[in-house]
Amino acid sequence: MVNTDYFFSSLRHSGVELFTGVPGSLLKDICAYITDNTSPDNHIISANEGSAISIGIGHHLATNKVPLVYLQNSGLGNVINPLLSLADPDVYSVPMLLLVGWRGEPNIKDEPQHLKQGKVTTDLLDAIKIPYEVLSPEMSSEDAGEVAKKMVERAFTLN
């Protein structure tokens, strides 16, 4: 299982300072850890996912740093407009790291309302050309930390 402290430290060592998003049940541990270990100026709980993306964009434009935006996969529909009309490499080329809680993941028992969104999550990310890595519960903390580092580096090279 991924150690929250190690994963958070990996993000910090990769230069992530701002954390913003909409908490979800699958991300409750990392969200609680962020709240306990980040100043209120660097952890902004957003009213919706699109606003969180916009906050991340503003942070990057002001600091040239990569923000982390967290959300549940049901919020992906809310992030499409600001991602494609502002953050996209063809527009303002704003790098950011998305941490998406995957409800309705195929072959994992979940509530009926999450099943369709879960089925199309990776297809949706592929359609809008968002590269992703899946963090599994079996993944070691070290491997998850390496994924975080790699994704922050990738965010800069894509933009």
Regions found by a protein language model. Give the residues of each.
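Thiamine diphosphate
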Residues: 1-157
